[in-house]
A protein has these predicted regions:
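Sec-dependent signal peptide recognition
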Residues: 2-9
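C-terminal motif of bacterial Sec signal peptides marking the signal peptidase cleavage site
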Residues: 14-17
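Lipid interaction determinants
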Residues: 21-74, 85-186, 192-231
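Short beta-strand-centered aromatic/proline hotspots
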Residues: 77-79
């Protein structure tokens, strides 16, 4: 009798173990949350995406999330993955460092901040930065009065690397160079898909600026009045 009882208990435990094992496999198939699974470029649309996240093999990330028509949250820095959460340490704004829960469905959809994102490609080539190293003039005006010009004022963005830039406002006086002046403001930015997201070092929100280097006003967005607005 005892032998029969022990056999029944052993059989029950074996069946329970198999069931738990199958549940673990099914759970793993339904949702992936490891580092290897998140390494990619993700967008909410194939064309004209409004929400973009990118995680690279080297541990760096870029995030662009639309908050309103003229306000996008953006962040760059380093990340780590642990138990279904990706911890993002922002390069510039401490308050923008955050831990995000995420999951990847069996159909390959990334669930991030309540947004469904599609895998577009690998990060290394997806966010090619055409602005790195440029000192780009994007606006300006002449100074003077009726019938004469005393100088000019110019707006530049000096892109020092992939993440950091300086917004520069300079005044040049043709006949009085001692009055020349230049003001620099430290900025951080993300360039993606011919658009620029640019903010001062302690801010993380930006309009979505169009980038057209063939135009004199090459960084701009169109407001609700149909007007071009420069940085």
């Amino acid at each position: 009798m005892n032998r029969i009882y022990l056999l029944i208990v052993a059989l029950f435990m074996m069946l329970a173990s198999c069931s738990n094992s199958n549940d673990d496999v099914e759970q793993g198939e339904n949702s992936k949350t490891n580092k290897e699974s998140i390494v990619a470029l993700w967008q909410d649309s194939d064309k004209e995406p409004e929400n973009v996240v990118s995680f690279a093999k080297d541990g760096t990330y870029k995030i662009i999330l639309k908050k309103s028509d003229y306000s996008y949250f953006f962040s760059t820095g380093r990340y780590s993955v642990n138990e279904g959460n990706v911890s993002c340490k922002d390069n510039f704004v401490e308050s923008s460092s955050k831990e995000y829960p995420f999951s990847i469905d069996t159909n390959g959809t990334l669930r991030f901040e309540g947004i469904a994102l599609k895998k577009i490609g690998i990060e290394e080539n997806a966010l090619e930065n055409k602005l790195n190293g440029r000192n780009q003039k994007y606006g300006g005006y002449t100074m003077g009065g009726i019938g004469y010009t005393s100088g000019e004022a110019n707006y530049y963005v000096n892109f020092t690397n992939d993440y950091t830039a300086y917004k520069v406002f300079e005044k040049i006086y043709y006949k009085e160079p001692s009055k020349n002046s230049s003001k620099q403001t430290l900025m951080h930015y993300v360039y993606f898909d011919n658009h620029l997201y640019l903010a001062e070092e302690d801010h993380s929100y930006s309009p979505k600026y169009v980038v057209d280097l063939n135009e004199s006003n090459c960084f701009y967005y169109i407001n609700d009045k149909g007007e071009k607005v420069l940085p």
